[in-house]
Amino acid sequence: MNNRMYLQDLVQGRYGRKIAYTSVDKITADNVVKVIGECIGTFYYNKSVIRYLWNYYKGDQPILYRQKLTNEDITNRIVENHAYEIVQFKVGQTYGEPIQFISRKDDEAVNKAVDMLNDFMADANKQEKDIKAGEWQSATGTSFKAARPKANSDVPFLIVAPTPMNTFSIYNDSTEEPMLSVQELKDENGNWYKLAFSDTTSYKIQDGKLIESKLHTYGGIPIVEFPNNHERISDIELVIGMLDAINNMQSNRMDGVEQFVQYWIKFVNCQIDETEFEKMKKSHALTVKSNNGDNKSDVDIMTQELNQTQCQVAKDDIWDNTLSILAIPNKQGNTGGDTQGAVELRNGWDFSKTRAKLKDPIVKSAEKRLANVVLNILRVNDNDLKL
């Protein structure tokens, strides 16, 4: 589905991704089908919005389907993909450097084990998956990372970043702790099924029936959600109205330029046939003749140029507000004798760092869950780090 409509028309004011909750205290083979059935509607609702935001991030934006009622022969559709710029900045801010685990104990054995864990993560190319999941996280409001065993390898585990368009988590409505992670997948015959993980058991469900249930050794839910914030609001949807306005303004500006170039010629009190007019255009000269002294003939070019300066001022104002809302520094350089600290304060870098700190606890909490799963996989594969 193309992004022909605006996001507001899709979400009807319900911004942020819905969170799936259950009231059960323990997931079992007896209730897992019911729990997933009660939450699947939330997943499908989120899926449509996530698809819209992901395609918007990649450049499929409503301006591309713009229709005009007047002068429809001059219809420019310009996408200034600031959504991509925003997401890349946010991802670089959080995941630009590899995430490192550190020890809070002054213990040589613990410090050495933590260093080994960091080495395992580096060998598993975790940062690449961090960036991939970070793009989903910023663009759509949530993302997932998972750990799974890898046989016959120096690194006995894989880090993967499944798409939130086929993955969701279910939380307990009183403790807000994750109870279940679910993936909607296809088998080799093209049949849909759901693969779910609790902290102790994996479940396979097909056609509304539980067809497989078995214990796992992950030591926790192996698929971990990494929300962008507690409301799962994406960085794009916070300012999407202004991004659409910039696209519309730039498209109209190009229309104005094209209409100025493709001018109309007005003939007053004279008639020129098409053949004669084409000859005149080639020679860049016009000859007209007045019928009488009272009705003088004249030829004029009808143009009305758009005030580009005023348009740029309005556009800059919208973009400055966008950067302010997202706490992204502007690109103004140091034009005076300011110190580096003064430049950072003036251009918004300090504010940007403060905003980024609000996201750190969310990422740390999710990383701890993922690290526990990795440690259990290592333990099962005779690489117990004793952490």
Region annotations inferred by a language model:
Residues I131-R232:
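Extended, regular secondary-structure scaffolds
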Residues M1-F157:
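Extended, helix-rich architectural segments
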Residues A109-A113, M121, N125, K129, ...:
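Short amphipathic alpha-helical segments
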Residues V11-I40, K47, A109, K150, ...:
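Charge-rich, acidic-biased intrinsically disordered regions
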Residues N321, I325-L385:
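C-terminal structural cap/anchor segments
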Residues E212-R346:
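Extended, charged amphipathic alpha-helical segments
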